[in-house]
Amino acid sequence: MKELEEKIRQFGTVLPGNVLKVDAFLNHQVDPVLMQHIGQEFAARFKDAKITKVWTVESSGIAPAVMTGLALGVPVIFARKHKSLTLNSGMYTADVYSYTKKTTNRISISKRYVDKTDRVLLIDDFLANGQAVEGMLQIADQAGVEVVGAGIVIEKCFQPGSAELAAKGVRVESLAKVSSLADGQVSFKQTEGED
């Protein structure tokens, strides 16, 4: 998605440890027009998947997930990372390691909002090692729902997440594919049909 790549080039910052900081438009300050376009793009890519719910993990996945749900006309569920006083029983849970924060969080989704007939699209802001998506897959397995794929805003192609998900049969659609962050520069992988 060229618009997203341009935002990354303009506002993204490469930090030590192969971290790409995009807090100017995605995970602190949010560009709602870009998020709307991201949601429309995911909806177009998965238009024939008969999706009934969109899932993500709080908090950076919420904006693109909500816009995807809006474009598809389906509800959005975000897995919580922290216990809530209002959501304290009847939960599906999984442990997820955060690459950027170097911590493990227990994510949870209420059984109340999950139906065994659901066809779920997973949305995440980044795909590096695939831990957040893997956690959502574990919850989907516990719930007995079908995952139709994973929509990723920014994929780090030089890390194993996408290949590991593909090996499990998960369809991955990434809007920006970063091939390298070497020397503080963001390089993108060319996709089929691009010059």
Curated annotation (Swiss-Prot):
Main localization category: cytoplasm
Q: What Enzyme Commission number does this protein have?
A: 2.4.2.22
Keyword field: Cytoplasm, Glycosyltransferase, Purine salvage, Transferase
Recorded catalytic activity of this chain's protein: XMP + diphosphate = xanthine + 5-phospho-alpha-D-ribose 1-diphosphate
Q: Name one GO cellular component term.
A: cytoplasm
Q: Which domain of life is it from?
A: Bacteria
Q: Which GO terms describe its molecular function?
A: xanthine phosphoribosyltransferase activity
Q: Where found? A: Cytoplasm
Q: In which pathway does it act?
A: Purine metabolism; XMP biosynthesis via salvage pathway; XMP from xanthine: step 1/1
Q: Name the GO terms of the biological process aspect.
A: purine ribonucleoside salvage; xanthine metabolic process; XMP salvage
Identify which top EC class this enzyme belongs to.
Answer: transferase
InterPro entries on file: PRibTrfase_dom, PRTase-like, Pur/Pyrimidine_PRTase, Xanthine_PRibTrfase
The residues that hold xanthine are 20, 27, 156
Q: Where is 5-phospho-alpha-D-ribose 1-diphosphate bound in this sequence?
A: 128-132
- Describe its assembly: Homodimer.
> PANTHER family given for it?
HYPOXANTHINE/GUANINE PHOSPHORIBOSYLTRANSFERASE, XANTHINE PHOSPHORIBOSYLTRANSFERASE
Tell me, in a sentence or two, what this protein's role is. Converts the preformed base xanthine, a product of nucleic acid breakdown, to xanthosine 5'-monophosphate (XMP), so it can be reused for RNA or DNA synthesis.
Q: Which family does it belong to?
A: Belongs to the purine/pyrimidine phosphoribosyltransferase family. Xpt subfamily.
Q: Which protein, by its recorded name, is this?
A: Xanthine phosphoribosyltransferase
Q: Which source organism does the UniProt entry give? A: Limosilactobacillus fermentum (strain NBRC 3956 / LMG 18251)
